[in-house]
Amino acid sequence: MAASHSLGEKILIKLIRFYQIVISPLIGPRCRFVPTCSCYGLEAIKTHGAVRGAWLTLKRILKCHPLNAGGYDPVPPKSDNHSKENKK
């Protein structure tokens, strides 16, 4: 069963898919991370919603530069937000 997404989530997902289909093939692979930043963005938005997902994606994109080695950097699980708050 497909999850229903808010309008904001749908717009962000379509923008990322546009990038993946149209822009990324033109510029070639450049991401230093696994999953790629665009795949990370899709997963973050689907998992955390439009606002938090966009924030996580922006932070990830800002880390993707030549001075960062990259590597495996998965989207944090949704329950991670609550566990950090409970530990305070």
From Swiss-Prot:
One of its GO terms (cellular component) is plasma membrane. Residues 79-88 have a biased composition (Basic and acidic residues). Residues 67-88 are annotated as: Disordered. Keywords: Cell inner membrane, Cell membrane, Membrane. PANTHER family: MEMBRANE PROTEIN INSERTION EFFICIENCY FACTOR-RELATED. Could be involved in insertion of integral membrane proteins into the membrane. This is Putative membrane protein insertion efficiency factor. It comes from Actinobacillus succinogenes (strain ATCC 55618 / DSM 22257 / CCUG 43843 / 130Z). The lineage of its organism: Bacteria, Pseudomonadati, Pseudomonadota, Gammaproteobacteria, Pasteurellales.
